[in-house]
Amino acid sequence: LKPVRLFSTDLDGTVVGNDEATARFREFWGSLPEETRPLLVFNSGRLIDDQLELLDSVPLPRPDYIIGGVGTMLSRQDEPRLSQAYTSQLGAAFDADKIASVMKDVPGISLQPDRYQHGLKSSWYLHDADDDMLADIERRLNDNGVAARIVYSSARDLDVLPLAADKGAAIRWLCNHLGIGLDETVVAGDTGNDRAMFELTGVRGVVVANALEELKSFATGKHNMIIAPKEEADGVIMGLEHWISSVETPK
């Protein structure tokens, strides 16, 4: 196994949730030798401003990059052009009215608050949707001229995203931009919208103990995935220790 050069983690339910565990993760991260410490990427459904606010209220280490809106935004504080370069390859902003006209016929669906929306992410609540219902919504969107895909997680959160966007695609783009291999990357998460990170060829994964079955079932039995016996940030620490310590040392 190659050294870990980039670590991409979801926030809520993964490194965020229990502040004491989050503080232990920050301490662990700071204890890694600076010269070999991986780049830290937060990869959340939260929009970037929301993540920056969260950083002020919970004891997280500072990230090198922030991916927001389920892979539709990418930011680094000292590299403003990066965000534009990333979003420009995702295509034009959605027509919110077209999406709303499709969704109005879906029983039980409701629009999420404004803080979860932006031009390339239309987010809705829909409880316990099955695959057929999701496929039908996606087909109707495409029939109405909305070139989009659906990411559904937690049996509740439905995100309409550009065809080229999800948490995994954002990591692939960033790794390519940085010249880092996916086989030098570790990812961590707890729900279905994290699955796209785990599906990347060559990555190593950490699934926390409190993860939903939609992610655990995907990771079970895969040699490059570990399901940690601890929850949230404590599970992340265990998983990272496993993958960092299992790196081949040069002979």
Question: What spans do the regions from the language model cover?
Answer:
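Mg2+-dependent phosphoryl-transfer enzymes with acidic/Ser/Thr/Gly-rich catalytic loops
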Residues: 2, 22, 161, 168-251
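Asp-based phosphoryl-transfer active-site loop
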Residues: 2-20, 198
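The start of beta-strands in P-loop NTPase/AAA+ ATPase cores
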Residues: 5-7, 64, 185
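Active-site metal-binding loops of divalent metal-dependent hydrolases
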Residues: 11, 46, 190-191
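Active-site phosphate-binding/coordination module
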Residues: 18, 23-114, 210
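Conserved acidic, metal-coordinating active-site core of Asp-based
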Residues: 97-201
